[in-house]
Amino acid sequence: EQQVQALFKAWFVDFEPFKDGKFVDSELGKIPEGWKVGRLDEIGEIVGGGTPSKSKAEYYCDKGIPWVTPKDLSITHAKFTSKGEVDISDLGYKNSSTQILPKGSVLFSSRAPIGYITIALNDICTNQGFKSVIPKIAGTAFIYCYLKNNIKNIESQATGSTFKEASGSLMKSLKVLKPDDISIYRRFEEVETSLFEKQAALEEENLRLSTLRDTLLPQLMSGELKIDSLNR
């Protein structure tokens, strides 16, 4: 993860690949000539979520549409997510304001708390505790790194009396750098993709091992499973 963030900083904070060019002043400081300061909703689509009625059991199921809440991420702290604790049914989806987010979308928890970030491994939807970003011009890696680097900035602009929330309008209006050549986004994505793939594979293996541990440990503790049987 440190390498992922270091690359983002090198490209879009320190501008190391562009040091030989001319720099100009902007509201975000010195930037390469030709680059512009835009909005987050110019490089990605900001999408909210929703919760089907909890009083309707038929709106929830074990194998339906993956549905994620901030609580799920508070447990897993996963960078990549395929599902939450419970899925919603087609009926639940039709009767709520949640929306399907395609693979590669970046999920950002916008309240309670602000700042959980995860990447969708498949089509997925969320509750209203998220303002997610579907990549358009920029790719998944750029948007993920951008949000990671702007959590404190987003928190400082969040509003609310009971608890702070980053609204959809706030997320859409976040300032973001737009290179004069948008292929720079693509080149950055190509560099980061291999790192992301390795991270996803490691997370999957760690999940498999922890699931195996949680299955075997109670059996060993109860005497239902003997250590000798594991060595055969």
Where are the predicted features?
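Non-catalytic DNA-recognition/assembly elements of restriction-modification systems
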Residues: 1-7, 13, 18-51, 67, ...
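Proline-centered turn/helix-capping motifs that create local helix->coil transitions or kinks
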Residues: 12, 16, 75-78
